[in-house]
Design a protein with these regions (language model features):
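Oligomerization/assembly interface segments of phage tail-like spikes and tubes
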Residues: 3-4, 36-39
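Residue-level micro-sites within transmembrane alpha helices that shape
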Residues: 19-22, 116-117
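Alpha-helical cap/lid subdomain in secreted, periplasmic
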Residues: 78, 94-228
């Protein structure tokens, strides 16, 4: 009888230890899940590295592309902070020179909108390609997802230049494996009501159209980071 009693007590103690272990494990699991949920609840961060088309030349800050993209994302159920890293007049070389500090603490996505001023100045397409390639390579090295916004050369630059320049962006997208929004000014350029008096920079209505056009590409590029 004594042996049976000892075994019963031992079994009870073992059960209590097991129960405490399971409860502790469950508590840890709940805490981890809560932490993960809180982390996912944080807004995603997007940096737009660009020129005056990003900076919002001639516009109020709330009408600039990054601000309107943030509003468009929110309307689509994506909680995001879109940072304006645009500098008017900037070229691909200028964007490369300020790349590291512009990216800050590794955003969830970097949108690269550069090249328009390269074309307007007639800079060598090969140089533009190399600068943008270096930007995309750095993003890849830092494991920052990128989205490339394409640009087209103005017709007055001539067919040869236009052919060489326009081929830059599809080639970069293929060679670096990044998504491409083919033409940043799609639906806006050539539409006077959507352009400022200079015929180059979009009005607030033009920016709204740009944000709406690129929105699906941004959401797709964010991928698993986005929690609706």
């Amino acid at each position: 009888m004594q042996t049976i009693k000892v075994r019963g007590v031992s079994g009870l103690l073992a059960y209590r230890v097991l129960a405490r272990t399971v409860n502790t494990a469950l508590l840890i699991l709940v805490l981890l899940m809560a932490a993960a949920t809180a982390a996912r609840a944080e807004p995603v961060t997007i940096v737009v590295l660009g020129d005056s088309l990003t900076a919002g030349y001639g516009l109020d800050a709330d009408d600039a592309f990054p601000a309107r993209l943030q509003v468009a994302l929110a309307a689509d159920g994506v909680d995001a902070v879109v940072i304006n890293a645009g500098v008017s007049g900037d070229t691909s070389a200028g964007g490369l020179s300020r790349l590291v500090w512009s990216m800050g603490d590794a955003p969830d996505l970097a949108i690269i909108e550069l090249g328009a001023n390269d074309a307007l100045r007639g800079l060598a397409p090969d140089a533009t390609y190399e600068n943008l390639s270096a930007i995309l390579q750095w993003l890849d090295d830092q494991r920052i997802p990128g989205l490339l916004a394409g640009m087209l050369a103005p017709p007055n630059m001539g067919e040869d230049y236009g052919r060489a320049f326009n081929a830059i962006f599809p080639a970069l997208a293929v060679n670096h494996g990044v998504p491409l929004y083919p033409f940043f000014l799609a639906g806006v350029i050539g539409e006077p009501r959507l352009l400022q008096d200079d015929g180059m920079h979009p009005t607030p209505e033009g920016v709204e159209l740009i944000a709406a056009g690129i929105l699906p590409f941004v959401v797709q590029a964010l991928g698993a980071v986005v929690v609706n």
